[in-house]
């Protein structure tokens, strides 16, 4: 049954908040923990639906998991060659990360496997990973010539390649690096811009021979992965909703604790600062190879800016809520070079234009982005998540500056990346 949330405008955000663990890092911790020798203990793991899909995929291949009393996840690693052939189709749910990264990993196994997903995932492009993996010798079948799931894989030994990626995609890069663990010879990926590097960092943490260079990365196979402890920081994509909310609601001052601030992911901080946002990083430190900080955000008068180029892949998941910030900034904000937004859980350019437009925002779609003309406030209306977790949470933030309560429909999807979002969102607001 569809869930709805009614958001009343106003209510400054004050105090402290800690967001759930990083979704991208959680996926990779499960995957590499399963492939590692010995036990891996993961602390701070996100229990969102996407990550649970990854966990269940490995459970179906014989990996044992158990929960500690303190909330940590213990993974009994089976080593690089210890996975078992799954007896049923692997259901990736709504998770593009699960499907794309698993495609690389499964391509190098010595068994047969099939992956599918929900109606949204089955519309998302997979050829971008299927194509280069096929060049490595993988045998993968899918709808429309491998463009769409379900995907069927007959695993085999792969050959390392040098791949020049047309887009800066961490999922493509990660799929090839995971396939490269099972390849003869090195695997090299070149990118037009640097994408998030969580896979490289965690592969290195587990003992793989990964060599980043300007414009790309090379993995040399042959190293076994060693289990250990992984501490997952808070997800900057989840923190972004609270950052924008605190910036746009007058009188707000919010401290967001223990957030991952990896430079390949912190584009949202750079963009919001460029817009005039008062954002400060405190207590900077390192956890399991990832930079972490506490983020102090104070309400600010924002201004419109131009956003494009190398910052786009560093903030690709945050553009729905960045567009909310732009709706309250003085002047025009132009987002370009972001065509990748059209192939997310929904077409996020069309989704944000339609839902923000319903509230009266001046948002104009472009093929590779949008133009937003800011104003002091929005109207009130019933809006929808459209089944996309980031759209739903972005509309909740927009509602804080509406003229009357806003109803957001179909909000159950927020559990994909942020279970407990609505409770946390309400807890930091003064009523």
Swiss-Prot record:
Gene3D superfamilies recorded: Enolpyruvate transferase domain (3.65.10.10)
Residues the entry annotates as binding 3-phosphoshikimate: 23-24, 28, 169, 171, 317, 344
BP GO terms, sorted: amino acid biosynthetic process; aromatic amino acid family biosynthetic process; chorismate biosynthetic process
Localization per record: Cytoplasm
Positions of the catalytic residues: 317
Classification via NCBIfam families: aroA
HAMAP family linked: EPSP_synth
Official protein name in the record: 3-phosphoshikimate 1-carboxyvinyltransferase
Organism: Syntrophotalea carbinolica (strain DSM 2380 / NBRC 103641 / GraBd1)
